[in-house]
UniProtKB/Swiss-Prot annotation:
Keywords: Ribonucleoprotein, Ribosomal protein, RNA-binding, rRNA-binding. This is Large ribosomal subunit protein uL24. It comes from the Bacteria. Part of the 50S ribosomal subunit. GO terms for biological process: translation.
Length: 102
């Protein structure tokens, strides 16, 4: 997967198109990511120790990784991600600017 937890991304498709956020979780087996503040859904929560009242809560649901694009830190614009091998390590590179991505 070309994105990691902590990356800043922009949603490029779907109901939240244009929103930006940070990736909080990745689901590698299903190629999905959870982006902070994006794809908020209502969940009916049973009473538990964490939620003694229960009720309806808002949570962030995962979206497919193809619907997000990484933001280039130098230009703050969406970019595709390339990979290079330097000193025997695989690193991520911005396709637009050529800069190394964290």
């Amino acid at each position: 997967m070309f994105v990691k937890t902590g990356d800043k991304v922009r949603v490029i498709a779907g109901k939240d198109k244009g929103k930006e956020g940070t990736i909080t979780k990745t689901v590698a087996g299903k190629d999905r990511v959870v982006v902070e503040g994006v794809n908020i859904v209502k969940k009916h929560q049973k009473p538990s120790n964490e939620y003694p009242q229960g009720g309806v809560i808002d949570i962030e649901a995962p979206i497919h990784v193809s619907n997000v694009q990484l933001l280039d830190p130098s230009t703050n614009e969406p970019t595709r991600v390339g990979f290079k091998v330097e000193d025997g390590k695989k690193i991520r590179v911005s396709k637009k600017s050529g800069n190394v991505l964290g």
